[in-house]
Amino acid sequence: MTLVDLSITPIQLVQAYGLVNVAYLPQGATADFDARSANLLSSVGLPHSEVFTSREDVEDPYPADLDPTTLGSRFDHYGMPCPAESRSWRMLGYLFTSLVAVDPASGRVYAFPEGSAGYIALHRDVESLVYALVEFRKLEVDHDNDVDPEELSRRFKQVVGAFDPVPFAHEDSQWNLSLEELEHGMW
């Protein structure tokens, strides 16, 4: 599979997170995904960090007959209600405390905030999610180098918002909440 017209490359992701912090999905695991998402997940991958956790906890094994990446079976396993339209969506990981899932048919990415029974649109597609995570990693590095938090927040919103306005459309988006914490010195 070739990387056709993707705005993020495997090299950019590895440079931002390091090779050991990139998780790739096997092509077979993405067979029911839209072609663009399947290509990105198997060729570019997802980062794994404190901000975005893309790997399962090996200390929390699941029964052999459970698919923990499909939201319906995952939510059922934990005794949580799962909105009917999202039962076939696939879990990608956690962004801070929000479970992040993709609708494999459309490629749209949604967040299930902790303590909420519903979900909100997070990104127009998986490419936008990975793009935002790479930009957020740059923000983290600059924050560690004492760049002004308000400048970092403004720049992140400008760069990511120009690529995809969805991450900032909902006031309770995990991106908006984390940038608010950054601006208020809670990091």
What are these regions (language model features)?
Residues 78-81, 85, 132-141, 156:
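Charged, low-complexity, helix-prone segments enriched in Lys/Glu/Asp/Gln
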Residues 53, 62-66, 117, 134, ...:
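Short alpha-helical interface elements
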Residues 1-101, 162-187:
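A surface-exposed partner-binding patch
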